[in-house]
Amino acid sequence: MKVNTNIISLKTQEYLRKNNEGMTQAQERLASGKRINSSLDDAAGLAVVTRMNVKSTGLDAASKNSSMGIDLLQTADSALSSMSSILQRMRQLAVQSSNGSFSDEDRKQYTAEFGSLIKELDHVADTTNYNNIKLLDQTATNAATQVSIQASDKANDLINIDLFNAKGLSAGTITLGSGSTVAGYSALSVADADSSQEATEAIDELINNISNGRALLGAGMSRLSYNVSNVNNQSIATKASASSIEDADMAAEMSEMTKYKILTQTSISMLSQANQTPQMLTQLINS
């Protein structure tokens, strides 16, 4: 039996340190809910989780981008829907004004409303915007001819969607079914029967053009909607993978904490007894 060095006490102190360290680690994991709280816990796992977290935050941002893109396209589509409704009313007026039994004087009541509807078409085309970006007037300074959406967390992964230049229908030319052309809607008139007939045919082409424009916007919204679903699913899968690596098993950690708590208490008791060994030897020698 050694007297100068209390080997049992030293070993017990080391066990006590390890048990206390294990209990502290289990308590930290229970408190944070994470198995990895520092690189000391799992350096490789922490590196993987960090990359996964970066990817998932990028995917979440891409989902928001696509959702904003859908909002933008819905704004443009809603405005085109209003323009289509206005054109339908203008067509109704043109058809009524085409009636040969009306005099030019009789048509004045249609002309006034027809002119005000032309102004409203311009108003819709001029003022429709999203976040101060002109959507239907590509002649404006802050106009957009195409919207580019960052589709994922990868650089330059863009979805490009062309916008419809509704303002161009105002001063441009309209090709009729006969092959002839007329000026844009701003020049249409129902002042007489011939003008009303021409306006009716022109409005049919305008409505068709706007319908085609809305179809393009609808296709863009559909694509963005699928992209939102895709990146959301990727983000969920990435977060689940990170969770399986990083998050603590609460039941297992509770069991670990209980185990180390018991071992720590036992180590303290054993250390107390080990420290009494020299005193017992002294008493034995004295006796």
Curated annotation (Swiss-Prot):
Chief subcellular location: secreted
Listed InterPro entries: Flagellin, Flagellin_C, Flagellin_C_sub2, Flagellin_N
Pfam families (UniProt xref): Flagellin_C, Flagellin_N
Localization per Swiss-Prot or TrEMBL: Secreted; Bacterial flagellum
Role: Flagellin is the subunit protein which polymerizes to form the filaments of bacterial flagella.
Family from the record: Belongs to the bacterial flagellin family.
Annotated protein name in UniProt: Flagellin
